[in-house]
Amino acid sequence: MTLDLDAHKKDDKLLITTIQQEYKILAEYKMIESEKLSGIYVIPSYANSLQWFGVFFGRQGLYAESVFRFTILLPDRFPDDKSLPTIIFQQDVIHPHVCPYTHSLDVSHAFPEWRCGEDHLWQLLKYLQVIFSDPLDSIRGIEVDKLKNREAAELLMNNKEEYVARVQENIKESKEHIFDTPPTEDPHYIVFEKFQQDVHGPVLERIKAGRSKQTEPSAQQGNGGHATGLSWVKEGEFKPLSIE
């Protein structure tokens, strides 16, 4: 009987710990939403909240027009564990901070360890955004042999023309796979559809109309003078059309 009670207590403790962790992860997601990071979309997996799906859209600099899919893997005891979350790209990405073999992004230069309550996932994504916006600046003050891709770093510093050419190859490849069949059946995997006038046309017009109304004085006053982004998601699926 005593053994049964101890087992139940352990099960209850594990359940409570799991629920608390889920709330913390949900809070991280809410913070990302509130930060409105331009060009980055992420969502936790439906099956496993420790795995997130993401897409990075390059908006400026050498990586403009890139579309890089990535996965975020959170440590089992996130966010209490000091271990860092892992970001892994789904394709080759040439960058001094991206390992050419595992496609993983080295975030240790910005986050030596994870500090619960101080470090957040939105900051991790902001770091991703910044290092792709200006890769050269992202390696200033760091010894070349401490970078994940030494060859990329040396090209960036000494042969920028060749570096740009390789980046363009990455960008071309990324665009060729935008509409690929999802590698998973997880309903939260981010899916993109080719534009279809009969399906997406009406939604696009609603987005345009909404943006037009937000520029009117009355609309801005009703929202405290702040414009908000608009998005529509196909019912039952995660296929967004949005405007920031």
Curated annotation (Swiss-Prot):
Any one GO BP annotation for this protein: sperm individualization
InterPro entries on file: Ub_conjugating_enzyme, UBQ-conjugat_E2_core, UBQ-conjugating_enzyme/RWD
Pfam families from the UniProt entry: UQ_con
Region (Disordered): 209-244
Domain annotation UBC core: ranges: 20-176
Similarity comment: Belongs to the ubiquitin-conjugating enzyme family. FTS subfamily.
Name of the protein this chain belongs to: Protein crossbronx
